[in-house]
Design a protein with these regions (language model features):
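Short, contiguous strand/loop micro-motifs
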Residues: 9, 43-44, 141, 167, ...
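Non-catalytic C-terminal accessory region of glycerolipid acyltransferases
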Residues: 129, 174-292
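Membrane-anchoring hydrophobic helices of lipid-metabolizing enzymes
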Residues: 1-114, 118-119, 153-156
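Catalytic core of membrane glycerolipid acyltransferases/transacylases, capturing the structured
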Residues: 68-71, 109-171, 201-203
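A structural signal for well-ordered alpha-helical scaffolds and beta->alpha junctions
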Residues: 15-18, 37, 53, 72, ...
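Short coil/turn connectors at secondary-structure junctions
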Residues: 108, 135-136, 188, 230
Length: 292
């Protein structure tokens, strides 16, 4: 039987009623009970979500990790805690002082290609710090159907962060490209994931060596980044003990032709992804079979 793509997997454990209960518990009792709830929800998902569990076990086998089942469960648990952190971030209750930033000031006029290592979405807490960052708009491209239940629930909170605007990645058009280019020129920044192929563009992909296996990655993100002709960075935000560490690397190429630059971009991005996947394997939140 062919393994499911990530966009074909249902969102076990993320029902609207559960999230409403989560908010109720958070409002009444605080963060610690929410973490306890997350533990049991993750345990339920781990036991019931066979496709996700098998994909996780396969990943840890590929990287020669010992204690496969324990590593897989820790990966699930880390993901559950990352959702709680995301929840706290949107509620404005995640302490921005818990972040360790890159030494270089990179958060201006740039295009960031993200990964599903760690939890880059919680960086929204940083951009609410007016004394640390100049007011600017952050533009995020998301899969329209990614974590739909969770995102719909966040909308019911009626929280609006004017500095952040989300775009559906499936709806990129020439008009979008012009608008985003103008925004970056005005000091805004853009985030877009580079490690998941969308349902609409499943055939627009390139194949690369990742963890000694051939894996397909989306080509659209890389082409879009080059087309804008702005500084491009690869970025992850991972939890290390009680702090979130942000690692970023700038894309550099001396090639003149766009096709040659694209090849450099493919190589450097996959190398970056592999590096931090191996450093933080239990925060590699791709719960589907990339290696089918």
């Amino acid at each position: 039987m062919t393994a499911k793509k990530w966009f074909q997997l249902s969102e076990e454990g993320a029902g609207k009623l559960r999230l409403q209960a989560l908010k109720f518990m958070f409002d009444k009792l605080g963060e610690f009970p929410v973490r306890i709830i997350a533990f049991f929800v993750v345990l339920s998902v781990f036991l019931q979500a066979k496709d996700r569990r098998n994909a996780s076990l396969k990943f840890f086998k590929i990287i020669n990790k010992k204690h496969l089942l324990l590593s897989a469960y820790r990966q699930f648990l880390n993901y559950g805690n990352s959702l709680v952190d995301k929840f706290l971030s949107v509620m404005g209750k995640l302490d921005p002082q818990k972040f360790e930033l890159p030494e270089e000031d990179i958060f201006k006029s740039a295009f960031f290609i993200t990964t599903h290592v760690g939890n880059v979405e919680i960086m929204r807490s940083l951009f609410q710090l007016k004394n640390k960052f100049e007011p600017k708009r952050v533009n995020i491209f998301l899969q329209a159907n990614a974590c739909k239940i969770f995102n719909d629930f966040l909308k019911t909170l009626e929280l609006h962060i004017p500095e952040i605007e989300a775009f559906p990645v499936e709806e990129i058009s020439p008009h979008t490209s012009i608008e985003i280019s103008d925004r970056i020129q005005n000091g805004e920044i853009v985030f877009m994931a580079g490690d998941r192929i969308s349902a609409q563009n499943e055939n627009i992909a390139y194949e690369a060596e990742f963890l000694n296996h051939k894996v397909k990655f989306p080509l659209g993100t890389l082409k879009f980044a080059l087309m804008l002709n702005v500084p491009v960075y690869f970025i992850v935000c991972v939890k290390d003990r009680k702090k979130y560490k942000i690692f970023a690397e700038k894309f550099v190429s001396d090639k003149q032709k766009r096709t040659e630059k694209l090849e450099d971009l493919k190589l450097q991005y996959v190398n970056f992804l592999e590096k931090y996947t191996l450093m933080y394997p239990e925060q590699f939140f791709n719960f589907y079979d990339m290696w089918e």
